[in-house]
Amino acid sequence: MPRLPPILRLLQAPEKYTVIPKARISSKPAKSPTSAMDQAVGMSVIIAGFMVPAGWVLSHLESYKRSSAA
């Protein structure tokens, strides 16, 4: 097994010299600005997406307790 460390060094060599490309991040303003109505609709959909399932679970909490105890 004395040949294992040189083989491992050969496998690790390409890792040292890999070139990682820069991320292409642009900070330009939006091409079409978002209206207040679009923002309101988006926020209400996000809030409803979180609150409706949570409310459903909380309203059925007693039935969950009964079914797990049986």
Swiss-Prot record:
Per the record, the pathway is:
Energy metabolism; oxidative phosphorylation
Per the record, its GO cellular-component terms are: mitochondrial inner membrane; mitochondrion; respiratory chain complex IV
Keywords in alphabetical order, please: Membrane, Mitochondrion, Mitochondrion inner membrane, Transit peptide, Transmembrane, Transmembrane helix
Mitochondrial matrix-side positions: 25-35
Hey, which stretches end up on the Mitochondrial intermembrane side? 60-70
Membrane-related topology note: Single-pass membrane protein
Transit peptide extent on chain: 1-24
SUPFAM superfamilies named in the record: Mitochondrial cytochrome c oxidase subunit VIIIb (aka IX) (SSF81431)
- Subcellular location field: Mitochondrion inner membrane
Partners and quaternary state?
Component of the cytochrome c oxidase (complex IV, CIV), a multisubunit enzyme composed of 14 subunits. The complex is composed of a catalytic core of 3 subunits MT-CO1, MT-CO2 and MT-CO3, encoded in the mitochondrial DNA, and 11 supernumerary subunits COX4I, COX5A, COX5B, COX6A, COX6B, COX6C, COX7A, COX7B, COX7C, COX8 and NDUFA4, which are encoded in the nuclear genome.
Q: What is this protein called?
A: Cytochrome c oxidase subunit 8B, mitochondrial
Provenance organism: Rattus norvegicus (Rat)
